[in-house]
Structure formats: C-alpha cells, structure tokens
A protein has these predicted regions:
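Outer-membrane pore/translocation modules
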Residues: 33-50, 55-56, 60-151, 167-171, ...
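Outer-membrane beta-barrel "beta-signal"
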Residues: 82, 185, 206-221
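Strand-connecting loop/turn motifs
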Residues: 30-34, 59-61, 86-90, 123-127, ...
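Positively charged n-region of N-terminal signal peptides that target proteins for export
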Residues: 1-4
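Sec-dependent N-terminal signal peptides
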Residues: 6-8
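Outer-membrane beta-barrel biogenesis signature
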Residues: 17-41, 221
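Glycine/small-residue-rich hydrophobic helix-like segments
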Residues: 159-195
C-alpha cells in the first residue's frame, strides 16, 4: 500500500489546472482513493495553471479530500467534501463543496466552490451518455462565477482488453449572463482504473484553454 501511495504522489507531482473536464455524479466508493491532476495552458496569454486533487471514499456515497491549485501567480489549497449516488443507469447525481485558502497569505480564506454533477446513459448499452456540471464560485460574499457545462459522449471500445476512448463535445453557459455560450470538447483514454484526458474549452474566446490530465482510482480493500 505504501508503494502504491508513493506512486500516486509521484504521478501527481510529475503531471500536476482548474479545468472543467466532465465530472460524473458518483463518488469513488468505500475505501477507494481517487486522484485527478492536470495542466492547463491558456493560448495567447501564455499562462499555465495546475490543479491536483486526492479524495478518499469514506462510504460508497461520500468522498473527503484536498486539492492544490496554482493560477499562474497564487497557490491555493482546498478541502473537499463530495457526495453522490447512481440512482439508475440513466441518472446519477452528486454535489461537491470546497472552501479554498490562499497559501501565500497565511492560509487566508479565498473562495468557496460548489458543484452539482449529473449524468446518465442515453443508449441501453451505455456507450452514448450525457453529463452536466453546474459550477458556482463565491468570493468576497458574492457569486463571482456561475457556469453550466453540458456534454454528450460516446465510448468506443479498443480491442477486447477493456480499453476504450471516449470523445465528448459540449457547451458552456454562463448563468450570470455576462458572456456568450462557448464550446468545449475533448476525449479521454481509459485503461483499467486510469483515464488520460486531452481537453479544450473557451474555444470562441480570445484565450482558448488546452488541458492534459490524468485521473485514477485505487481500492484499499
């Protein structure tokens, strides 16, 4: 187990952006360790962001964990509480709450992130599916950001070993009505308990973002 944890930490350090790749409604599961780490590049602005999170399943329906985020100038740590459940093959729902603190200002509270995740199958075999994520960010006692990310995806099996690639495309809607609808698309490759993402969003803006990320889940049982 110690060797596995060390491997995970090294992966995070090596790969470690606050990026909205699709999040699904379910949690990691009881006694399972979940990790996600990404790098995001904002074109033309030539800035890099990094984001990493580790979460542990305390029950089948609840994760607790922490994340680290660097926006190009400041570093933040967040403490995550996530819950979720699969109600049927066609509907899963979950929520996440993360207060974040500025590490450069003596752990001063910076902002609160709240999210609602929903997803479900469209076809009976589960290959075609939908995902929707609602992200709210509150700073200085006011709602600073409210975005809706909605995706369609299709899983394409690769061979007979359980590997697959899943292209997805979606739109980004601003619930504050301060920006135009935008596009997001990408794909992830799945091998056993590991997903590797190549993603992009803000396509129609002056500064599109490009993301590379890895996601993994291991059981402690």
């Amino acid at each position: 187990m110690k060797k596995t944890l060390l491997t995970i930490c090294l992966m995070i350090i090596a790969i470690a952006a606050k990026a909205q790749v699709p999040n699904f409604g379910t949690t990691a599961g009881d006694q399972k360790l979940y990790g996600y780490s990404a790098m995001k590049y904002k074109a033309k602005a030539k800035t890099w962001e990094t984001y990493s999170t580790l979460q542990y399943g305390v029950t089948d329906y609840m994760n607790v964990g922490a994340d680290l985020y660097y926006d190009g100038s400041d570093s933040y740590i967040g403490y995550t509480f996530r819950t979720g459940k699969k109600f049927s093959p066609y509907f899963s729902a979950g929520a996440q709450f993360t207060p974040s603190f500025n590490l450069g200002e003596n752990h001063k509270f910076a902002y609160m992130t709240e999210a609602l995740y929903m997803n479900g199958n469209i076809t009976r075999d589960g290959r075609m599916f939908w995902v929707t994520n609602t992200w709210l960010e509150q700073a200085n006692h006011e709602l600073s950001s409210a975005k809706q990310w909605t995706y369609l995806g299709y899983t394409c099996p690769l061979g007979n070993k359980g590997n697959s690639i899943t292209p997805m495309a979606g739109i980004i809607h601003d619930w504050k009505f301060e920006s135009d609808v935008d596009l997001s698309f990408g794909a992830y490759y799945s091998h056993k308990n590991i997903n590797v993402y190549a993603w992009t969003n803000d396509i129609l803006t002056d500064h599109p973002r490009f993301v590379l990320a890895v996601e993994f889940k291991f059981s402690n049982k």
